[in-house]
Amino acid sequence: MARININNLTKQFEHVTALDDVTLELEAGQIVGLLGPNGSGKTTLIKLMNGLLTPTAGSILINDMEPGIETKKIVAYLPDRNALPEYMTTDQLISLYEDFFEDFNRAKAEAMINDLGIDPRLTLKKMSKGTKEKLQLCLVMARDAQVYLLDEPIGGVDPATRDYILRTIISNYNENAVVIISTHLIADIESVLDDVIFIREGKIVLHESAEMIREEKEESIDQLFREVFKC
């Protein structure tokens, strides 16, 4: 069962504080929305959890391990922009993931990609932005990971692609895992969320269950987000 413990986490870049004394505890079996405007610290937090950045202060533990080589075996990461080699075909990318990740399910990836009707001989360079986003998500969700870190998976794509991405996440994630989705597009995603984190200027301003927000505050997550982040 996945477990993430973040304690007093701070990240500074020269004189800019991207994250300021963040403390969170996240358990398996949840889809968590990491919600905030652009520049609020969402991507920095996800990169720290994935071991791509190191903290200035504080700590992150994933199943009692600091982010590194061992956690990469159980963490599936979708970056906020395409990170796959443009010259590779779909078949080559599937083989690449199969070589890198022991928990990668080739048959599952092929089934998802086949449903999209993508020619396996087509290189990434010749695909549309929406198709690239779908393909990259299929590769990530074909892993039987314990933690899924999805950075802006629905940003910059059309509504039909957003619907596909959300369906793919819901139908393919491991229920013993925790899924963290960062976005500022709240209305599109709130129906799938179990837990909600609001982040602003590197600080956590709210961490609550989606159900509690709807029941106690009697409003949608999108409505609350607009109130909290009103200019």
Residue ranges and their predicted role:
Residues V32-P37:
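The feature captures the beta-strand-to-loop junction immediately N-terminal to the Walker
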Residues N50:
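Helix-to-loop junction immediately C-terminal to a conserved catalytic motif
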Residues A57-T71:
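Conserved ABC transporter NBD signature motif
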Residues R81-L135:
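ABC-family P-loop ATPase nucleotide-binding domains
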Residues Y148-E152, V157:
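Catalytic Walker B motif of ABC-type/P-loop ATPase nucleotide-binding domains
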